[in-house]
Amino acid sequence: MLSHRNLIANAFHYMTTVPQREDDLMLVMAPLFHAAGSNGVIANIWTLGTQVTLAAFDPKIALDLIQTHDITESLGVPTMLAAIAEEQHARPRKTDSLKLLVHGGSPIATEVLRRTHTAFPAAELVEVYGATELSPICTILTNEQE
C-alpha cells in the first residue's frame, strides 16, 4: 500500500528534475486509474497547475486540446506519443505551447523518439521508469540524459 507520504515524496522527486510552474496546463492522456495517470498529476496540482483530461485516448482529440488550450505538458505511454506524433505529421496543429512530453510504461523505440521530436520540436522529451510499489517513479531521464 502506498502512503500519502510516499506519493508526496515521489512528486517532490519528480519536481526536482522536471520543474513545474503555476501556469502549466497538463493534458492527462494516461488513465487516472493507473499510477502513471493519478501520480502524474500530483506535482502539477502541488504547484497549482491545471489539468485537462481525456475521457479516452484519441490522438486527434489530444492534439485539438493541445492547440485549443495551449497545453504546456503531457504524459503518456510510448504508443500514445507515437500516435500523436503521426497525427501531427499528417494534420499539423499549432502545438508550440507544448514544452514537455513525459513517457513511460514501456520501452520507446528510437524512431518513435525521433518522430515525436520532429513533430513537437519545442517539447522536451522525458522518460520515467518505475512501478506502482515504488510510488511509482524511480528513474527520470531528461533529453540530455537520453
Segments from the language model and where they lie:
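Conserved AMP-binding A3 loop
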Residues: 1-12, 141
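Conserved AMP-binding/adenylation subdomain of ANL enzymes
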Residues: 8-25, 33-73, 87
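Active-site phosphate/pyrophosphate- and oxyanion-stabilizing loops and adjacent acidic/basic residues
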Residues: 12, 82, 114
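Nucleotide donor/acceptor-binding cores
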Residues: 24, 30, 99
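Residues at the C-termini of beta-strands that transition into short coil/loop
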Residues: 30, 36, 55, 105, ...
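Gly/Ser/Thr-rich phosphate-binding loop
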Residues: 46, 71-76, 85-146
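Alpha-helix capping/helix-boundary segments
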Residues: 58, 79-81, 108
